[in-house]
């Protein structure tokens, strides 16, 4: 294992504590994600539109990420990574302690999301910077795989716990507290990363450059399509099919296993065939996924359509791994690691510009017109994303 990692990462970077921290943060996220939808539906009593409103506020930190990172422009990527972890911890502690008020719970989710989004930009940046030349795709695949393994462990704990113990507000808060403790472990590991990354030459961590226009627009369409499944996919299973926390965590676990096993392969595929081919082809599968998720119940009995929707959710998670290709695309266009870091961070905020409105409008569309319309729109957005990705001109040949 050590030799395999050494073949991917540069010798002069602290990739071991970085990967350790990612694993623990993944585990904490697994506990959080495994119970969140059921907590909001069963304890906080949020409906379709309420869930969209909560997601709207959860995504706002992503939109503000550029400004947040600009404030920290003097800090290294490693230090920002740690700051994100501390903010995540604050939000998780709040979730474990506050009453089940829609407003207060939404604020806690928003705080956790701020830390999560700060880390997201730095994870992409560090994954590319720490990699040896020509290994960026494999590096992104490895770190995604490790994060998913930690997430899987969190899901497994929730699956077993809610099979044995009764569901309720106290039970949910207990696991939010456990997740907080695990984040503390991750913060401790991240302190060993030091602050070795170079500062941006122009003292900025964000900017818009003409050569990245296609990347920014692709992030908009990808963010919109992703948001539909991330927010409303699981909530459909909870509200419409009555799936409990144990069932949802098991589904998330299966999804995490598939992503963990396949993400390194997707990374290799990006390095071998090129990011453009991967960015274009994933949407063809997405159309099938959206059709069955939105219309399965029209063709099959409820129990069968539930299983089909679960399978489609897992398949969507797998094809979402192709988003790693956009980070390699940015590296291909960039003149320096600093430019890569700034562009990826900006891309996260561009992604969320449309995402927050999809979250808000998605709940309304579901409530007024039905789930079929929502997933039809998602499929159309995906096709637009694929068509635009086909116009990309690559400047480097795929690795042989």
Question: What does each of the following model-derived ranges do?
Answer:
Residues 158, 162, 180-198, 388-392:
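C-terminal membrane-cytosol helix-exit motif in multi-pass small-molecule transporters
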């Amino acid at each position: 294992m050590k030799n395999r990692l050494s073949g991917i990462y540069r010798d002069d970077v602290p990739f071991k504590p970085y990967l350790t921290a990612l694993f623990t943060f993944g585990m904490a996220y697994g506990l959080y994600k495994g119970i969140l939808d059921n907590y909001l539906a069963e304890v906080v009593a949020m409906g379709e539109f309420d869930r969209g409103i909560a997601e709207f506020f959860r995504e706002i930190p992503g939109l503000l990420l550029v400004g947040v990172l600009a404030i920290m422009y003097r800090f290294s990527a490693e230090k920002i990574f740690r700051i994100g972890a501390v903010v995540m911890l604050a939000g998780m502690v709040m979730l474990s302690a506050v009453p089940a008020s829609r407003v207060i719970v939404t604020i806690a989710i928003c705080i956790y999301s701020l830390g999560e989004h700060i880390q997201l930009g730095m994870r992409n940046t560090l994954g590319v910077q720490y990699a040896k030349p020509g290994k960026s795709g494999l590096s992104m695949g490895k770190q995604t795989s490790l994060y998913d393994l930690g997430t899987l462990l969190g899901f497994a704990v929730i699956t077993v716990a809610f099979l044995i113990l009764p569901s309720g507000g106290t039970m949910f808060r207990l696991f939010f507290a456990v997740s907080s403790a695990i984040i503390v472990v991750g913060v401790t590991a991240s302190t060993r990363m030091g602050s070795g990354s170079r500062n941006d030459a122009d003292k900025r961590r964000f900017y818009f450059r003409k050569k990245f226009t296609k990347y920014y627009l692709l992030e908009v369409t990808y963010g919109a399509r992703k948001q539909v499944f991330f927010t409303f996919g699981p909530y459909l299973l909870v509200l419409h099919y009555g799936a409990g926390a144990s069932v949802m965590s098991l589904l998330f676990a299966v999804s995490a296993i598939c992503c963990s096993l396949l993400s390194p392969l997707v990374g290799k595929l990006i390095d071998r065939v090129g990011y453009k081919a991967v960015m274009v082809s994933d949407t063809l599968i997405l159309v099938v996924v959206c059709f069955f998720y939105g219309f399965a119940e029209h063709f099959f009995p409820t129990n069968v359509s539930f299983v089909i929707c679960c399978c489609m959710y897992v398949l969507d998670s797998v094809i979402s791994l192709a988003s790693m290709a956009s980070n390699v695309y940015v590296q291909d266009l960039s003149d320096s690691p600093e430019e890569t870091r700034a562009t990826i961070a900006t891309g996260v905020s561009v992604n969320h510009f449309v995402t927050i409105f999809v979250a808000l409008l998605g709940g309304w569309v579901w409530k007024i017109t039905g789930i079929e319309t929502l997933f039809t729109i998602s499929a159309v957005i995906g096709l637009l994303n694929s068509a635009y990705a086909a116009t990309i001109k690559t400047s480097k040949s795929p690795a042989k």
